[in-house]
């Protein structure tokens, strides 16, 4: 019985079963190599809690799960990449010297007017007007430089005369037009003074001829003489104006002279304005003489 029990307890293929081998000791389990644990799919295990996750399955069907070389330490690689990215962002922030904004600064920025509000519109309008004025000043300076640059005009003898500008530009210069206006005014005033002097000459002072109370039809009872004291001398006692038509003609001439002065002034102003318009148009369309 013992031999049979021992034989019953022997492992097949071992001695004692007719095949040779080491008989098993009673009371001890036969020594077998432990089974290796099956590999688990970590991706499936991590995503098992998500809705719609697929059922867990082995990496290799009908075979024990094995980790391929490309699947090793994926989580560690992700963590390393994340650390590198964080370090790069920190270096970029330190290089830009980013300073955290204080709450009061944010409040001040929020209180600024938005685009489209009247304050911003006024500021934009002021800047636009300032830009227009600066552009106009630049145009005037360029026009002045173009008018004052030296020109050379050939003469009949072959010599050249250095001119500050072309004759047309000189005529259209504001200084020339202003001088022309003053010249017209001065000439008009001088013309008026000449008329006043002629009025004094035309004034006739009555003086009886010596030894004659009367005069015949062929003799003149009065001789014209220029008054020594001006027009006031004609109003002295003993003098009278025998011919009122001359005085009327003198007054008419004086009125015409005043009108002539006014007309001259108006023409001078109109010439000046026309010159400015022509000068502006010539600048916009291009130089008059190249």
Curated annotation (Swiss-Prot):
Q: Does the keyword Membrane apply?
A: yes
Indicate the principal place this protein occupies in or around the cell.
membrane
Q: How does it sit in the membrane?
A: Single-pass membrane protein
Q: Where is the composition biased (Low complexity)?
A: 87-97
Q: Which domain of life is it from?
A: Eukaryota
Q: Where is this region: Disordered?
A: 1-98, 209-236
- TM ranges: 261-281
| A GO cellular component entry from the record | membrane
Print the keywords alphabetically. Answer: Membrane, Transmembrane, Transmembrane helix
Q: Which residues form a coiled coil?
A: none
Q: Where in the cell is it found?
A: Membrane
Query: Where are the compositionally biased (Basic and acidic residues) regions?
Result: 63-76
Record flagged with keyword Ion transport: no
Question: Can you say what this protein is called?
Answer: Uncharacterized protein ARIH2OS
Source species: Homo sapiens
């Amino acid at each position: 019985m013992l031999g049979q029990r021992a034989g019953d307890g022997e492992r097949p293929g071992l001695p004692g079963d007719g095949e040779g081998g080491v008989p098993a000791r009673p009371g001890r389990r036969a020594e077998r190599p432990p089974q290796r644990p099956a590999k688990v799919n970590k991706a499936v295990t991590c995503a098992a809690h998500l809705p719609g996750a697929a059922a867990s399955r082995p990496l290799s069907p009908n075979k024990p799960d094995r980790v391929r070389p490309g699947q090793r330490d994926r989580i560690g690689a992700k963590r390393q990449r994340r650390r590198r990215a964080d370090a790069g962002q920190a270096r970029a922030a330190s290089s830009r010297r980013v300073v955290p904004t204080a709450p009061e600064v944010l409040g001040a920025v929020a209180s600024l007017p938005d685009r489209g509000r009247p304050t911003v519109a006024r500021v934009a309008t002021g800047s636009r007007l300032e830009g227009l004025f600066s552009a106009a000043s630049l145009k005037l300076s360029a026009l002045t430089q173009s008018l004052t640059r030296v020109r050379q005009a050939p003469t009949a003898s072959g010599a050249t005369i250095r001119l500050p500008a072309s004759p047309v530009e000189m005529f259209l210069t504001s200084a020339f037009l202003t001088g022309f206006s003053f010249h017209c005014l001065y000439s008009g005033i001088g013309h008026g003074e000449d008329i006043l002097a002629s009025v004094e000459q035309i004034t006739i002072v009555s003086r009886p001829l010596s030894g004659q109370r009367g005069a015949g039809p062929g003799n003149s009872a009065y001789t014209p003489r220029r008054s020594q004291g001006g027009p006031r001398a004609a109003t002295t006692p003993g003098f009278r104006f025998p011919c009122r038509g001359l005085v009327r003609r003198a007054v008419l001439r004086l009125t015409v002279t005043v009108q002539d002065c006014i007309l001259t002034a108006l023409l001078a102003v109109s010439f000046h304005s026309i010159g400015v318009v022509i000068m502006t148009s010539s600048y916009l369309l291009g130089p008059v003489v190249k």
